[in-house]
Amino acid sequence: MNNLIICDTREKGNKKILEYFDKVGQDYIVSKLESGDYMIYKDYTTIIDKKDTLLELAGNLCNTLEHKRINREIDRAKELGCTNFIFLIQDNKIKSSEDIKNWHSSYMPNLKGEVLLKIMNTMKERYSVRFMIVSKKDMGKTIIDLLMKK
């Protein structure tokens, strides 16, 4: 079984994740990916797209140009054979759908959490993607577990 993780060169803020990979002996390379931020080398089954905050995800899903880019990225992943596209949202405060529903941001005051949750649910239905909230300290382990299907 192939255990080499590829991390996209455009993925920012991944220093702690790569340090975790080093700590646990997880092999990885940094290389440009066609879709997402993390995957197993030559295995497109599972692709992970990491978001640093729920606000980043909201911006991606609610901005028309960004939303179209995300849709193209998911379509590209599926063309490559991806059957498990996962958005990993790094957030220490959000724990549940109810927390997303009650979410608000001063940066996007017109977007209510309830609307964001509906958009996420529509994406789940339309594109068969998953959304997972993960704490910053657990991000590296979660990426390995999802890609290695532990």
Enumerate the language-model features and the residues they cover.
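Non-catalytic C-terminal interaction segments of nucleic acid-processing enzymes
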Residues: 1-43, 57-150
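Conserved catalytic cores of phosphodiester-cleaving nucleases, focusing on short active-site segments
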Residues: 46-53
